[in-house]
């Protein structure tokens, strides 16, 4: 479930500011916005004080993209005539379930396999199976893929290869 971008205001300028902040691209995966990723948690605009408070949650603790995202939020706010305060909240921890459907589509169209849904926690014993995960190739649609390396071009991606079209591709890891 994507976490909503919230805030209240009746005028267009803050809505434009919210939209501009939500449209900031992730520097490590520049086809998805911070809203698509679900890391943009809240945008609160104070028109009188000309300030905006933005709450973000990193995809993982120590994510190097967060400094660039914070700087970009501050730049966008200044461009709109606002001072920005950007806060990072680690709890609840970000999950790939917060990726929007549009974000998943953008990843796939860019050649990155989007993550599957996480398993839900249940208060009882669960059975385990030793079956390989089925990851669909974003290039040809085959599920005959294999993991080449658990560590891809960024910490949030793994490197895979399609056994049908033989092309390598990134997989966005499910967290």
Language model: regions and residue ranges:
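Domain-level signature for proteins that mediate thiol-based redox and metal-cofactor handling
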Residues: 1-175
